[in-house]
UniProtKB/Swiss-Prot annotation:
<dbReference type="InterPro" id="IPR012340">
    <property type="entry name" value="NA-bd_OB-fold"/>
</dbReference>
<keyword id="KW-0238">DNA-binding</keyword>
<protein>
    <recommendedName>
        <fullName>Protein MCM10 homolog</fullName>
    </recommendedName>
</protein>
<keyword id="KW-0235">DNA replication</keyword>
<feature type="compositionally biased region" description="Polar residues">
    <location>
        <begin position="120"/>
        <end position="134"/>
    </location>
</feature>
<feature type="region of interest" description="Disordered">
    <location>
        <begin position="553"/>
        <end position="591"/>
    </location>
</feature>
<dbReference type="InterPro" id="IPR056791">
    <property type="entry name" value="Znf_Mcm10_C"/>
</dbReference>
<dbReference type="GO" id="GO:0003688">
    <property type="term" value="F:DNA replication origin binding"/>
</dbReference>
<feature type="compositionally biased region" description="Polar residues">
    <location>
        <begin position="164"/>
        <end position="175"/>
    </location>
</feature>
<feature type="region of interest" description="OB-fold domain">
    <location>
        <begin position="230"/>
        <end position="380"/>
    </location>
</feature>
<feature type="compositionally biased region" description="Polar residues">
    <location>
        <begin position="144"/>
        <end position="154"/>
    </location>
</feature>
<dbReference type="GO" id="GO:0003697">
    <property type="term" value="F:single-stranded DNA binding"/>
</dbReference>
<comment type="function">
    <text>Acts as a replication initiation factor that brings together the MCM2-7 helicase and the DNA polymerase alpha/primase complex in order to initiate DNA replication. Additionally, plays a role in preventing DNA damage during replication.</text>
</comment>
<feature type="compositionally biased region" description="Polar residues">
    <location>
        <begin position="214"/>
        <end position="225"/>
    </location>
</feature>
<comment type="similarity">
    <text>Belongs to the MCM10 family.</text>
</comment>
<dbReference type="Pfam" id="PF24863">
    <property type="entry name" value="zf-CCCH_Mcm10"/>
</dbReference>
<feature type="region of interest" description="Disordered">
    <location>
        <begin position="18"/>
        <end position="225"/>
    </location>
</feature>
Length: 860
């Protein structure tokens, strides 16, 4: 056999040659060894063999065997071949020693020629990239990762190219055997042996999960929460073809451009229409979707297992397509996680289930499915159902966090709060909650207060909390009798009397003895109230008066008392004036015409209110002047003032001076010449004493130039540009405040946009065949009379009339006219009514006036 002959030749060369020649021989020997293992790789690429190191054999042979056993793993056939090879080596050792050196040289030339041919073949095929010669040896893990990144190059062929330069160091450094790799790459078929359809498929989609596979990495399915929630603070770019944000992408954008070159992109929403109207078999087409649901693998009639995936593009979550995986496709991709973005190449349409218009697809090759990564925006609704369980509806987190069934309730919840106080409670407290222990006051005041350095209790005891709970009294005949007003008044008086007889405590007495305003007011009140006023008349019942009525009564009493005092004072004043008139003499001409009241009068201001009397103060026969236009006489000086005035005039006359009369028409006082001279002297003396500063002698232009130079100086600019070192912290705080303010508004806007985009909604409705109607719930008469009604799925649609009236219909169109305007011009709208803000002036301006629907000419 050729294998035995080569092994014998290698053994003889290793034993006879010198240490310098041994390295060269070993390099040719290793390359020939690799040639012999080509058949083994071609036979089974996926297998890995492992064998233990033989300590009795030579170092070089053991190194080669250990290298290959590390690569391939444990198989019994290889062990038997190794044992047979060791026997042949021992038998041929004696024969090899008898060969001459010429034969060895010829054999070496042949081996060198074979190595050159092998290198030329490797360069022509270009199956793998040559590794750098600086790496003495590669571990099986590194080989596996590199083989996955290249175009499915086998590890053994990659090793052949590297061993041509590094075989000697590898033989001298034996490797440690490792365990069998869990994820071994599968062999890829040559493109030359494939059909044209397979060539297209291989150029578009290759299993991307193998390119990122690592030894020891678990292939178990991850929980769906990892694919639904996106980390906070990370931004993901939108993939060009699928229109989705992808986490951990497995295919680069340039690779996707190359794969999509010359192929038609069809969206999932358009797929049903495209299958019905176009012939997709004549061209290459691709569609993308997200695995929103995985049905448990099932078994077909022939015993084969298949699985079903629900795909959606996250645009319309109510509509999805079903992808069936059979045979090799199921074996290859059945472990794919939910929430993965996939691409399908030339999927085959299937017949839908009877009674449904669902789109069903299938693929016949695993490489027609491209795994692109995890969808970031796929999630579940954050609301809860009426029974308390979390909602399981799928949502697009990039659009809204709530499904179409809970978005309206969440919008009402957000809108009921103030925009500035989104996190606080601003609603009205129900009375029933305020009375009990769960009221707003009790819930807010649980920990007490600390104000002004003094701690206080949480809240004062209210009347409702202090009163003992009412006990149920057994009803008797006396309780059922209606009592009259006198009985109720008697009971009230008894309660008041019992309250007066309350024994006062020592603490209350001590507080009353203190000179505080409260104690003084209470004493004054208690001393002023008579017991008769409290009890009232026996026959009159006690009436309850409100505070406003009591204030009005008190004000009226004060006005009455003031009026009474004014009348009394006026009466006394009139009596005093009459007495003074009688006592006055008739001949007193020196008295004033209008005499003032005497000092004993108590009400002088009431003189105007008195009745006038003609001729008061005049005697009979005196002349009365009603029109006296003479000026009033000058006031006369007293005798002492007159004497002083005369003395001053005499002194002036003795000095020869006279007083000039003042001009009555003069407006401005004239200054004398002496005063002007004094002012001029004072100004001159002040100017001579004050020193002149040098700055005053400089021109104003130079001062202005110096000021501008200082403003442009480096020192002033440094002061001007000085900023606080806490500016960054301040900006961060402002950003946080803005986010805290705008986040609720952004969420509210997302809810509004989602509600406006929802034009129809699936729901459960009931149809009564007896009454011939369809509604959300049956009538009471239908239930009581056992009519023929049944529940089924329906679609609720939203419509709007031009007048603004809105309605809901379970049919294609509403069956009734508008109840407001009577028109039948219904228009499809969203769930939420569009908000109309303030209009501009151009929108409300009517240059021709108000437009009328009918004119006079139209009536003819």
């Amino acid at each position: 056999m050729e294998v035995d002959a080569d092994l014998e030749l290698l053994t003889s060369l290793l034993e006879e040659n010198e240490a310098a020649e041994r390295n060269g021989v070993v390099s040719h020997e290793a390359s020939s060894e690799l040639d012999e293992f080509d058949e083994l790789f071609d036979g089974d690429e996926d297998g890995s063999y492992h064998g233990s190191d033989n300590g009795t054999e030579e170092q070089t042979i053991g190194g080669v065997e250990e290298d290959f056993t590390t690569l391939f793993g444990d198989i019994d056939d290889i062990k038997e071949e190794e044992a047979a090879a060791s026997d042949t080596k021992k038998q041929s050792s004696s024969v090899c020693q008898e060969k001459s050196k010429d034969e060895l040289e010829d054999e070496l030339r042949k081996m060198q020629a074979q190595m050159k041919k092998l290198q030329e073949q490797l360069q022509k095929t270009a199956l793998a990239k040559t590794s750098s010669p600086g790496n003495p040896k590669k571990s099986p893990e590194n080989k596996m990762v590199q083989s996955g990144k290249t175009s499915r190059t086998s590890p053994l062929i990659e090793r052949k190219k590297t061993d041509s330069n590094t075989v000697a160091p590898q033989l001298t450094s034996p490797t440690v055997p490792k365990a069998k790799l869990p994820d071994a790459p599968k062999r890829k078929q040559n493109l030359s042996d494939k059909s044209p359809v397979q060539k297209k498929m291989a150029s578009f989609l290759s299993p991307p999960e193998k390119s990122s596979a690592r030894p020891g990495q678990s292939t178990a399915t991850q929980p769906i929460t990892n694919t639904l929630k996106s980390p906070v603070g990370q931004q993901y770019h939108v993939e060009k073809f699928s229109g989705l944000r992808i986490r951990k992408p497995r295919v680069s954008s340039s690779e996707m451009e190359r794969k999509m070159n010359g192929r038609k992109l069809i969206r999932l929403a358009q797929l049903q229409n495209k299958i019905a109207t176009e012939k997709l078999e004549e061209e290459d087409w691709v569609t993308f979707g997200v695995i929103v649901k995985k049905i448990t693998p099932q078994s077909s009639n022939n015993g084969k297992t298949f699985s079903i995936w629900r795909l959606n593009d996250l645009k319309d979550l109510d509509k999805y397509i079903s992808l069936f995986l059979f045979g090799d496709v199921h074996k290859e991709h059945w472990k794919t996680d939910q929430g993965t973005v996939i691409g399908l190449l030339n999927a085959n349409p299937m017949k839908p289930k009877e009674g449904t218009d669902e789109v069903c697809l299938s693929v016949d090759n695993p490489q027609k499915v491209l795994l692109m990564g995890d969808a970031v925006d796929l999630g579940t609704c954050k609301a809860r159902k009426k029974n308390g369980d979390p909602c399981t509806q799928m949502v697009n987190l990039n659009d809204c966090e709530y499904c179409q069934y809970h978005v309206q309730a969440q919008y009402k919840k957000v809108s009921s709060k103030r925009a500035d106080l989104q996190s606080s409670y601003s609603g009205h407290v129900p009375k029933k909650m305020a009375r009990g222990a769960n009221g707003l006051r009790e819930r807010l005041c649980q920990g007490g207060f600390h104000y002004g350095g003094v701690s206080s209790m949480a809240y004062a005891a209210t009347l409702g909390s202090t009163t003992a709970p009412k006990k149920t009294v057994q009803s008797t005949l006396s309780n059922m009798v209606v009592r009259g007003a006198e009985a109720i008044a008697l009971e009230a008086r008894q309660k008041i009397a019992a309250a007066k007889n309350v024994v006062q405590t020592d603490e209350f007495k001590e507080l009353m003895t203190l000179p505080t305003p409260g104690a003084l007011n209470l004493k004054k009140h208690l001393s002023g109230v008579s017991p008769q006023a409290n009890c009232g008349k026996e026959g009159q019942p006690i009436q309850s008066i409100s505070a406003s009525t009591l204030l009005k009564q008190q004000k009226q009493q004060m006005l009455n008392a003031r009026k009474k005092r004014a009348e009394e004072s006026q009466k006394r004043f009139l009596e005093s004036t009459e007495k003074s008139e009688k006592s006055s003499t008739l001949t007193s001409s020196a008295c004033s015409v209008f005499q003032s009241p005497k000092q004993g009068a108590e009400f002088p201001n009431a003189q105007k209110m008195a009745t006038p009397k003609l001729g008061r103060g005049f005697a009979e026969g005196d002349d009365v002047l009603f029109f006296d236009i003479s000026p009033p006489p000058a006031p006369k000086l007293s005798t002492s003032a007159e004497a002083k005035k005369l003395l001053a005039i005499q002194k002036l006359q003795a000095k020869g001076q006279t007083l000039a009369k003042t001009d009555p028409n003069s407006i401005k006082r004239k200054r004398g010449s002496s005063s002007e001279e004094l002012v001029a002297q004072r100004v001159a003396s002040h100017a001579s004493t004050s020193p002149k500063s040098p700055d005053e002698n400089e021109p104003a232009i130079k001062k202005h130039r110096d000021q501008l130079a200082y403003l442009e100086s480096e020192e002033f600019q440094k002061i001007l540009n000085a900023k606080s070192k806490h500016t960054g912290i301040l900006k961060e705080a402002e950003v946080e405040i803005q986010e805290h303010y705008f986040d609720p508004l952004v969420k509210k806007e997302q809810l509004e946009e989602k509600m406006q985009s929802i034009r129809e909604q699936s729901c459960r409705v009931v149809t009564c065949k007896t009454c011939k109607y369809t509604h959300f719930k049956p009538k009471e008469t239908c239930v009581s009379e056992n009519h023929d009604f049944h529940w089924h799925n329906g679609v609720k649609r939203f419509f709007k009339c031009p007048c603004g009236n809105r309605t809901i219909s379970l049919d294609r169109l509403p069956k009734k006219h508008c109840s407001t305007c009577g028109l039948f011009k219904w228009e499809r709208v969203g769930m939420l009514k569009e908000k109309t803000g303030p209009k501009l002036g151009g929108e409300t301006l009517l240059p021709r006036g108000e437009e009328h629907g009918k004119f006079l000419n139209s009536l003819k």
